[in-house]
């Protein structure tokens, strides 16, 4: 496995047009996962569609014996509910009973990570009553040489965040003087949250959050996002907007194309 400090990372990443929406995934998310043994993530929103988008990197993380720890807000997606609701102690065995063939591809990946104890999810709620939601967005990649790469910006752990929106975030490297203090602060914040020792935020294990009815099960932003995630998880490349435009433009040149 290549270490995190063996690659050149930009100080800032932002979405780029005409990349098919894959720039952040291809240039940052997957390469970072491929070099990591742990991925710690704080996000306002999480969806298993994000796992599908980065499935290549997730596979590499698993090959390294790695794991993911997520601290997320209370807004989770209805499409993930059939799997996430089985996390309670009395229901955890039912994860083994899920028929993967009856699950969409992105849910198969979610169920697999949970079964193998490679994905751990906690839910955060602000202690201050006037604060409506938990909304920070930060992540930390760790390799087996004790290097860490942290990022903070606008991107949520969803397909929309990594692929469909205009997003921008800054990156800090633990092995670079002047950047290590930012990484240390990010690690401290995450560990405070994970151990429920943050002064301003209450953190629950996901099964407890579900039992307390803290979760707001929201609809996906669009059905097309789910379909796109399924295609990616299956290894199928979804058509880009440019592809679609070319199909329409070339319509008259195709057999029967005058009907397009």
Where are these regions (language model features)?
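PLD/PLD-like phosphodiesterase catalytic module centered on the HKD motif
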Residues: 1-258
């Amino acid at each position: 496995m290549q270490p995190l400090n063996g690659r050149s990372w930009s100080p800032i990443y932002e979405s780029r047009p005409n990349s098919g929406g894959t720039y952040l995934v291809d240039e940052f998310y997957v390469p970072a996962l491929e070099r990591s043994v742990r991925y710690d993530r704080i996000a306002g929103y999480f969806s298993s569609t994000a796992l599908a988008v980065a499935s290549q990197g997730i596979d590499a993380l698993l090959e390294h014996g790695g794991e993911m720890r997520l601290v997320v807000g209370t807004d989770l997606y209805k499409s993930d509910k059939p799997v996430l609701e089985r996390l309670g102690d009395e229901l955890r065995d039912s994860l083994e009973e899920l028929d993967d063939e009856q699950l969409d591809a992105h849910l198969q990946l979610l169920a697999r990570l949970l079964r193998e104890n490679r994905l751990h999810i906690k839910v955060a709620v602000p202690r201050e009553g006037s604060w409506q939601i938990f909304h920070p967005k930060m992540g930390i990649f760790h390799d087996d040489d004790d290097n860490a790469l942290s990022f903070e910006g606008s991107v949520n752990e969803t397909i929309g965040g990594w692929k469909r929106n205009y997003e921008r975030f800054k990156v800090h490297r633990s092995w670079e003087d002047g950047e290590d203090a930012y990484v240390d602060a990010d690690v401290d914040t995450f560990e405070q949250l994970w151990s429920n020792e943050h002064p301003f935020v209450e953190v629950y294990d996901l099964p407890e959050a579900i039992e307390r009815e803290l979760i707001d099960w929201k609809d996906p932003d669009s059905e097309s996002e789910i379909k796109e995630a399924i295609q990616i998880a299956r290894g199928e490349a979804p058509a880009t907007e440019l592809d679609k435009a070319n199909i329409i433009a070339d319509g008259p040149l195709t057999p029967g194309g005058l009907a397009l």
